[in-house]
Amino acid sequence: MSQPLEVALFPIPSLVAFPGTIVPLHVFEPRYRQMINDCVRDQRMIGVCHTRKVIRAAKANQTQDEAMNSNQATYQPQAVFSAGYCDIIETTADGRIMAEIRIEQRLRIVKEIQSIPYRIVSSQPLHDDVPDPSELMSIEGRNRDLQLLINSKLLVMIGAANPEFENLINGSEWQSLNPDEFSYQLFETLRFDPDMMQAILEACSTQARLNIIWDYLCR
C-alpha cells in the first residue's frame, strides 16, 4: 500500500471533480482563503469533494460583508474525492481569491487529522482494479464501443440544440481521448446528477464508469 497523503479538503455540495480536469474556484470564506494560501505556500494538494450532509448551516440573510468575514456552512465530505495542486489566478482588493485546482488523482479518506480552521485528511490513492491480462483486449474493445455509443447518444440528445457542443464532440482532441480519459473528462463539459457522478468517481474500472454513464443516458 502506498504512503498516505495529507490533503486539505474543500467540500462543495453537488461538485464532483475528476482527474484530468480543472476546477475553477471563487473563494471568499476566511477559512478557505487561508487554506488556499497555505496550500500554495506548502505545496499541499487540495481535495474538491461532493458532500453527504450539512453539519452546521450558514447564517441566513447575510450581507456580502458578513459573508466575506465569517465562515459559512460546514459539510460532511464524501469519503472518495479528487485532488490536485492549486494555482491562484487573482486576489481581489477585498480579499476574494480566484483559483484553479488541477485535478490529478482520486483519493479515499483514511482519517481526519485537522478540523479547524479547515479540514485536513490522511488519504490513500484510489486505483482502478487491474484486469486479467487474458481479458484485456476484449475489455478495451468493449470500452471503445461504449465510448462511441455514448458520443453518438450525446450528439442526438444535445448536439442539434448546441452547435458548440457538437463541434467539441466531433473535434480531433475529443475524438483522440482514450476510454479512460473520456470516462473522466466528459464531466469537464457536462454536469449530471451529482450522486451519479459520485458513483462514477468511486467506480474502479473504465468499463464500470462507462456503463454508469450509458445507463444514465438511456433512462
Regions found by a protein language model. Give the residues of each.
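N-terminal low-complexity, acidic/polar interaction/targeting segments
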Residues: M1-R219
